[in-house]
A protein has these predicted regions:
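A short, exposed helix-loop element centered on a Lys and neighboring polar residues
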Residues: 98-99
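N-terminal Rossmann NAD(P)H-binding glycine-rich loop of SDR-like oxidoreductase domains
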Residues: 10, 14-19
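Conserved NAD(P)H cofactor-binding loop of Rossmann-fold oxidoreductase domains
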Residues: 67-72
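Catalytic loop of short-chain dehydrogenase/reductase
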Residues: 112-128
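Active-site loop of short-chain dehydrogenase/reductase
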Residues: 60, 105-117
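Substrate-binding pocket helix/loop in short-chain dehydrogenase/reductase
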Residues: 74-75, 82-84
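Conserved glycine-rich Rossmann-like NAD(P)H-binding loop of the short-chain dehydrogenase/reductase
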Residues: 25-37
Length: 128
């Protein structure tokens, strides 16, 4: 049984990964909102990774960062604060999380880190 930490596992892709991994792994979910299920292999920490210290987790094999944030507006409608907020969530949050858990992760079984992005970064969207 692996120990998997998911940042953003309460909704979307993060939640789908959480549900897929629960039967055969211990899953630690860190998100502002709790997942809609309970399971003996699930431990949830309700917090914003940018605002609070991350919880101590003793054993980690996989770290998955998928906070799910994007501003789909025309660039002229985005404020500097919009850009700053997205950067904080998608870059600073990922770096903070990796730095916090890297020492523990290095001790894991075949450790891995998975960072999710948005399709808009690759695909391009009109007026975005």
């Amino acid at each position: 049984m692996k120990n998997i930490v998911i940042i953003g596992g309460s909704k979307g892709i993060g939640n789908a990964i959480l549900l897929q991994q629960l039967e055969s792994n211990m899953v630690y979910n860190i998100s502002r909102n709790a997942p809609t299920i309970t399971h003996p292999n699930l431990k949830h920490f309700s917090l914003d990774v940018l605002q609070y210290a991350l919880p101590e987790i003793e054993n980690i094999d996989t770290l998955i960062y998928c906070p799910g944030s994007i501003n789909l507006k025309p660039i002229g409608s985005l404020s500097i604060d919009d850009f700053r907020n997205d950067f904080e969530i998608n870059v600073i949050g990922a770096v903070k999380t990796i730095q916090n858990y890297l020492p523990v992760l290095k001790k894991g079984t075949n450790p891995s880190i998975v960072l999710f992005s948005t399709v808009a970064a690759k695909l391009g969207m009109p007026f975005h």
